[in-house]
Regions:
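Short amphipathic alpha-helices in soluble, non-transmembrane regions
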Residues: 68-75
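Active-site nucleotide-donor binding segment shared across nucleotidyl transfer reactions
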Residues: 25-56, 60-63, 67, 141
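Short amphipathic alpha-helical segments and helix-helix/interface helices
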Residues: 22-26, 69, 92
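Residue-level marker for the onset of beta-strands and adjacent loop->beta junctions
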Residues: 25, 32, 89-91, 126
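Anion (oxyanion) recognition and catalysis
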Residues: 30, 73, 131
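Helical scaffold of the NTase/Pol beta-like nucleotidyltransferase catalytic core
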Residues: 1-37
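Catalytic cores of NTP-dependent nucleotidyl/adenyl transfer enzymes across multiple folds
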Residues: 112-166
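Conserved catalytic core of two-metal-ion nucleotidyltransferases
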Residues: 78-112
Length: 166
């Protein structure tokens, strides 16, 4: 696995806060033995494929989702359930932690053409990591997220990943 320190003094203040929150969560998840990885736009950011990210998408093993939720609950505000019909995710929790939007996702499932695709987190979907403020943050693979984005109809993200793979 690769490690790189992504915290730089030139990052905007809002990005620094996201990194601080991510580092804090990573430490707590590590201490509790939560199986997880960072996905979506933040994962693309750490791989150098995006200049920014809006929130933190934490993909967790389905069995660990309730414990992960309990770890995050005292750190911030749990928002009301806001699921859409495109997803049939078993555990989906949105938090605001120190002003940072954090999505906790366990048993991820995407509905496409009436078919539910099980996209649950698996530890073998992790193919790298980064060091954020002294904490190791596992990253889900680009290949896994390319498949997710394709099922979601996010063609711009698919092209972005494809162009990086060339």
């Amino acid at each position: 696995m690769e490690f790189s320190d992504v915290s730089t003094p030139r990052m905007p203040e809002a990005a620094e806060e996201k990194l601080r929150v991510l580092s804090m969560i990573a430490g707590r998840f590590e201490s509790a033995g939560i199986r997880w990885a960072l996905g979506a736009s933040a994962m693309l950011y750490f791989r150098g494929l995006s200049d920014s990210f809006h929130d933190l998408d934490l993909m967790v093993a389905m069995e660990d989702a309730p414990a992960a939720r309990d770890i995050l609950r005292p750190l911030g505000t749990l928002l009301p359930d806001n699921r859409t019909a495109q997803y049939r995710t078993k555990y989906f929790y949105e938090f605001t932690i120190d002003g940072v939007d954090v999505d906790l996702i366990g048993g991820f499932a995407i509905v496409k053409d009436g078919v539910v695709h099980d996209c649950s987190f698996r530890p073998d979907s992790v193919d790298g990591s980064v060091c954020v403020c002294g904490r190791v943050v596992p990253l889900q693979s680009l290949a896994v997220w390319r498949g997710y984005y394709e099922r979601m109809g996010r063609t711009a993200r698919v092209r972005q990943i494809d162009s990086a793979s060339r």
